[in-house]
Amino acid sequence: MRQFNLLLVFCLIALTALPVFSFPNGLTMDSIDMEPMGAFDENGAADESPRVKRYGGWGGRGGWGRGGGRGYGGRGGGWGGRGGGWGRGGGGRGFYGGGRRGWGK
């Protein structure tokens, strides 16, 4: 069982790193202007677009901050939030977990 858990963690880390390897050659972080996209806008937490509903955003509805929702950090699940787990609905067995659901349910 321990080996399965290690394999699962390794796979999740590998999947997280995939976008790094698929970064286009001619594109650099300096050439990307994030402000017109509204990526760091204060109202981004209240955005109700399908992308934010699904992936969380940057803090309001999940994301990597506090908030809630389904991202990598808010109440709803992820690393460091109140919910725990890697999923939508909260905790179960997450690193900081304690909710009713776990692991993507």
From Swiss-Prot:
Signal peptide range: 1-22
Name the record gives this protein: Neuropeptide-like protein 32
Propeptide: 23-54
Subcellular location: Secreted
Residues carrying Tryptophan amide: W64, W86, W103
Family named by the database record: Belongs to the YARP (YGGW-amide related peptide) family.
Top-rank taxon, per record: Eukaryota
Keywords: Amidation, Cleavage on pair of basic residues, Neuropeptide, Secreted, Signal
Entry keyword annotation includes Secreted: yes
Role played: May have antimicrobial activity.
Organism ancestry: Eukaryota, Metazoa, Ecdysozoa, Nematoda, Chromadorea
GO CC annotations, alphabetized: extracellular region
GO biological-process terms attached to the record: neuropeptide signaling pathway
KW Transcription (keyword) present: no
Subcellular location, principal: secreted
Sites bearing Glycine amide, chain numbering: G59, G68, G73, G80, G91, G98
